[in-house]
Amino acid sequence: MSWQAYVDDHLMCDIEGHEDHRLTAAAIVGHDGSVWAQSATFPQFKPEEMNGIMTDFSEPGHLAPTGLHLGGTKYMVVQGEAGAVIRGKKGSGGITIKKTGQALVFGIYEEPVTPGQCNMVVERLGDYLLEQGL
């Protein structure tokens, strides 16, 4: 399966039990910042934004004072899982980032999708990739 198929079929799909509820944008990005696959709506990010995200995984709390920035959008960092998941909130939407051995799985959402639904979609794919050694 191509990386694009993971984004299209496992991240940008209808959320279980909620037809027409899906993430706003999604991507799989290597730890080095190279995009493996992304939705057409995923924001163009700056290298320093990706560096900040990677630093927060190795030094949890790094982004808390400044917020998480992606594509020029600032998210308030909310409770995640140190070294494994970063979650951010902005207005009625937000972001979930799951770290795997080689990649970061991104999901961005807006209402009516809930934070819990975004977390489930992103973390389920991230856990699968971890199980595959990726």
UniProtKB/Swiss-Prot annotation:
Disulfide bonds join C13-C118. One of its GO terms (cellular component) is cell cortex. Phosphorylated by MAP kinases. The keyword Cytoplasm applies. The modification Phosphothreonine is found at T114. InterPro entries: PFN, PFN_euk, PFN_sf, Profilin_CS. PROSITE patterns: PROFILIN (PS00414). It comes from the Eukaryota. Its main location: cytoplasm. One of its GO terms (molecular function) is actin monomer binding. Keywords: Actin-binding, Allergen, Cytoplasm, Cytoskeleton, Disulfide bond, Phosphoprotein. A motif (Involved in PIP2 interaction) lies at residues 84-100. It is found in: Cytoplasm, Cytoskeleton. The keyword Disulfide bond applies. Binds to actin and affects the structure of the cytoskeleton. At high concentrations, profilin prevents the polymerization of actin, whereas it enhances it at low concentrations. The variability of the residues taking part of IgE-binding epitopes might be responsible of the difference in cross-reactivity among olive pollen cultivars, and between distantly related pollen species, leading to a variable range of allergy reactions among atopic patients. Occurs in many kinds of cells as a complex with monomeric actin in a 1:1 ratio. This is Profilin-2.
